[in-house]
């Protein structure tokens, strides 16, 4: 070590009053100054490329500390630190000491002593105290004869026994989609929170936003009943569980719903790196989920610009479990591969997957089923078994009440299309399908569409998810009224990630949205029956999900590879398809140059439209597509000889559809 460096180190020790070996102090100086951050990041990225591996944030921090010399080196990465870099770091620290001696001294002291303080052990003890007497995973296995009332009442009873931010899995065996849908929606609207200040400050605006949307809808009569329904809906924040995933077995007999419990908890959470409760907690990564920022000036994790460590309860617990390295937390690689997609094959491993993927070693698991079983120790978890609650009547959710009131006030005035093309085998109209359907002469025996997804495309922007559902409700009601009495409506939709903006309009409302189940609710309110749900397996889709190779609880999440194709009917009918998993690729709309060769952002394939053919009972009647888009439904009708009607609101897409149909 050069004389200049030694001199500066001595000066640091004199100013701070810290007496530490130079070989121990220098790595701390380098770490706090962050002069090597970019070079270390580049080195780690090169290491990942060479070895074709992925690293978690904890693993990157471990390597960084080794390269800086803070901890004993275990990797083979070569990394030399020059005297110039050391001098630069020392100059930055000395400059910082001149400006804020107390703050910088505290950071150096904390960094030097962090190794001797076993905060991980302390924090693990703290977590165990918080979770004592509670479950960290709830699994409910629903047999065919178990009613939705029993399931919902059981969920309500077990809710308070489940630790916050932890998971619930519901396994359905030969259960109809109608029941699954009702249970899922009840899970998200289980309770009401009245003390969430971020919502309380904007309640008036949220009520006004929805009221204005309803008032401006020409197909809805806004009256006192809707005013009262809006007031009731926004009487607090609906909460309970947040939807994560829906697994479907490839034989369609088994489905698995995954939810995470999220409720408001304002309890101060100590910093995981210094155990200080001197924290700030005014941030919410998700609605009702609070995060904190450490304000301890001596915390070893303070950033170069003085920001404290940011953290929330579940991320701290997961990182701590990862650091502890308990082998019981290692997920079997073959098991992770088997559930890599949300369409799976082997139902024999469901219990193992749920317990090892959605809980940690040492957690308590509550397993509800109709079968009586004894307590077991399973993959390092304590598993207790229980039965169902009685099937008391379940009240409608506030969402159901709101949408039902909207439906009661739908009054559509027919109007002529802006332009139209009518041929022997098809007709296409430009305008709003709700208003045009009352004017067209064609009789409709069936309908099929892929509706605009809530805020998933540039042409489908609604202020909130509720506003989107209102529009879809009105259009579905108009189609129900126009269809013949034995009419069928095939509806293709997938669950997406997006900001629902229902209670808070910001990034914190970003989550997985159950568009499929919300659509089922709409159709059920109108009077449709769910005949079947064909699962469109889109194969290997691109996804950031499950990109980790860390086979560790809550890191392993499935790739969403399917969409729903619901078959709704006006009268109860027997299903037409014995095989309900449909495999065909999505439309390729982008060429090798990155150009959109179809001109539409969300075209759907001809193979999907062909699924409607068995439901066409009268070949003199027409098949409707109320959201025609690029014209695929009409093109398919021409090719396979059935009559079609297409309606498109967007004039640009109407022109695109017209051109494609003429060229087909």
Regions found by a protein language model. Give the residues of each.
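Core catalytic lobe of class I
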Residues: 1-655
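C-terminal helical cap(s) of enzyme catalytic domains, especially alpha/beta-barrels
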Residues: 654, 658-664
């Amino acid at each position: 070590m050069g004389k200049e460096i030694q001199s500066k180190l001595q000066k640091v020790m004199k100013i701070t009053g810290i007496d530490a070996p130079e070989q121990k102090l220098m790595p701390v100086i380098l770490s706090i100054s962050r002069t090597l951050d970019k070079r270390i990041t580049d080195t780690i990225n090169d290491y990942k490329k060479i070895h074709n591996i992925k690293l978690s944030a904890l693993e990157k921090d471990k390597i960084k500390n080794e390269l800086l010399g803070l901890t004993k080196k275990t990797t083979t990465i070569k990394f030399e630190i020059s005297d110039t870099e050391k001098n630069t770091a020392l100059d930055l620290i000395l400059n910082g000491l001149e400006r804020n001696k107390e703050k910088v001294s505290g950071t150096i002291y904390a960094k030097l002593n962090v190794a001797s303080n076993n905060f991980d052990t302390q924090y693990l003890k703290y977590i165990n105290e918080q979770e004592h007497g509670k479950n960290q995973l709830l699994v409910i296995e629903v047999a065919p004869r178990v009613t939705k009332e029993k399931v919902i009442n059981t969920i309500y009873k077990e809710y308070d026994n489940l630790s916050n931010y932890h998971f619930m899995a519901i396994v359905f065996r030969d259960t109809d989609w109608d029941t699954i849908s009702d249970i899922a929606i009840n899970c998200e609207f289980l309770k009401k929170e009245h003390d969430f200040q971020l919502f309380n400050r904007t309640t008036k605006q949220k009520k006004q936003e929805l009221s204005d949307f309803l008032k401006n809808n020409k197909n809805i009569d806004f009256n006192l009943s809707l005013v009262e329904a809006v007031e009731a809906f926004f009487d607090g924040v609906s909460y309970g569980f947040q939807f994560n995933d829906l697994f479907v077995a490839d034989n369609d007999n088994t489905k698995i719903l995954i939810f995470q419990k999220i409720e408001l908890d304002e309890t101060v959470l100590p910093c995981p790196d210094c155990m200080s409760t001197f924290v700030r907690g005014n941030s919410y990564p998700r609605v009702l989920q609070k995060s904190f920022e450490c304000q301890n000036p001596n915390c070893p994790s303070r950033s170069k610009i003085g920001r404290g460590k940011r953290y929330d309860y579940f991320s701290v617990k997961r990182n701590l479990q990862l650091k502890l390295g308990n082998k019981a937390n290692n997920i079997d690689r073959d098991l992770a591969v088997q559930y890599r997609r949300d369409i799976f094959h082997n139902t024999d491993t469901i219990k193992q997957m749920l317990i090892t993927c959605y809980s940690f070693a040492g957690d308590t698991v509550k397993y509800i089923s109709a079968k009586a079983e004894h307590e077991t120790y399973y993959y390092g978890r304590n598993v207790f078994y229980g039965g169902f609650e009685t099937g008391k009547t379940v009240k409608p959710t506030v969402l159901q009440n709101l949408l039902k009131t909207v439906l009661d006030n739908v009054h559509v005035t027919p109007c002529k299309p802006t332009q139209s093309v009518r041929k022997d085998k098809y007709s296409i109209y430009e305008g709003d399908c709700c208003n045009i359907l009352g004017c067209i002469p064609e009789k409709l025996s069936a309908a099929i569409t892929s509706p605009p997804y809530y805020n998933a495309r540039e042409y489908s922007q609604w202020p909130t998810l509720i506003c989107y559902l209102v529009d879809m409700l009105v259009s579905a009601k108009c189609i129900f009224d126009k269809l013949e009495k034995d009419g069928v409506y095939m509806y293709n939709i997938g669950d997406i990630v997006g900001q629902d903006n229902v209670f808070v309009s910001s990034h914190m409302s970003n989550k997985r949205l159950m568009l499929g189940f919300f659509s089922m609710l709409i159709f059920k309110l109108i009077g449709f029956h769910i005949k079947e749900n064909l699962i469109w397996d889109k194969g290997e889709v691109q996804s950031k999900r499950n990109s980790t190779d860390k086979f560790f609880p809550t890191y392993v999440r499935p790739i969403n590879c399917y969409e729903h194709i619901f078959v709704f009917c006006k009268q109860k009918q027997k299903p037409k398809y014995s095989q309900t998993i449909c495999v065909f690729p999505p439309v390729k709309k982008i060429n090798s140059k990155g150009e959109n060769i179809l001109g539409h952002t969300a075209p759907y394939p001809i193979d999907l439209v062909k699924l409607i053919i068995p439901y066409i009972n009268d070949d003199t009647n027409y098949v409707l597509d109320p959201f025609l888009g690029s014209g695929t439904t009409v093109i398919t009708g021409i090719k396979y000889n059935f009559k079609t009607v297409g309606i498109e609101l967007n004039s640009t897409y109407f022109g695109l559809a017209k051109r494609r149909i003429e060229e087909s």
